[in-house]
Amino acid sequence: MNQTAPTARMPRQIPFIIGNEACERFSFYGIRNILVQFLVSSVILAYIPEAQREGAAKDVFHSFVIGVYFFPLLGGWLADRFFGKYNTVLWFSLIYCAGHACLALFEDNRNGFYTGLFLIALGSGGIKPLVVSFCGDQFTTANKHLAKIVFDAFYWVINFG
């Protein structure tokens, strides 16, 4: 009798995890590349003399980036202590989407726009420390040989952004 080993399959969650990360990175890099130019030319900083707008826009940009890289501490702590990786990634992804809604709705309202940037930084920070390990958690000993393929794709997506 010829028995073959069962073929291990790719976990069905993987495309969704990679897709979520691709959207998050695309969004972050898109905002990062145009935020200063947008702020200089928009009504958000119209109260500042034109000669000082670029400096003020860079201050906003750097505050946003600091938030993006500070909030992973909060996201990791919440996942480890209270909610787990899945729930934390899910809810912080929704916070991220709410931030984009604020940017779209409040393009000419300073408080609404800054709230959107804050929510995006919070959402990005909540996702950042968890998504790689959450991706790895989807594999068992039966399909761990597929993990290299997935992580190659995962890091390609992150860097392609």
Language-model region placement:
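Central cavity-lining transmembrane alpha-helices of secondary-active solute carriers
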Residues: 58-80, 128, 160
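Cytosolic juxtamembrane N-terminal segment immediately preceding the first transmembrane helix
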Residues: 1-29, 34
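Glycine-rich segments within core transmembrane alpha-helices of 12-TM secondary carriers
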Residues: 67-71, 124, 145-161
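Short amphipathic helix-loop junctions that connect adjacent transmembrane helices
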Residues: 33-58
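C-terminal ends and interior cores of transmembrane alpha-helices
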Residues: 89-115, 122
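Small-residue-rich segments within alpha-helical transmembrane domains of MFS-like 12-TM solute carriers
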Residues: 25, 29, 121-130
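Intracellular juxtamembrane helix-capping segments at the cytosolic ends
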Residues: 126-142
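Primarily marks hydrophobic transmembrane alpha-helices of the MFS/SLC 12-helix fold
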Residues: 88-89, 151
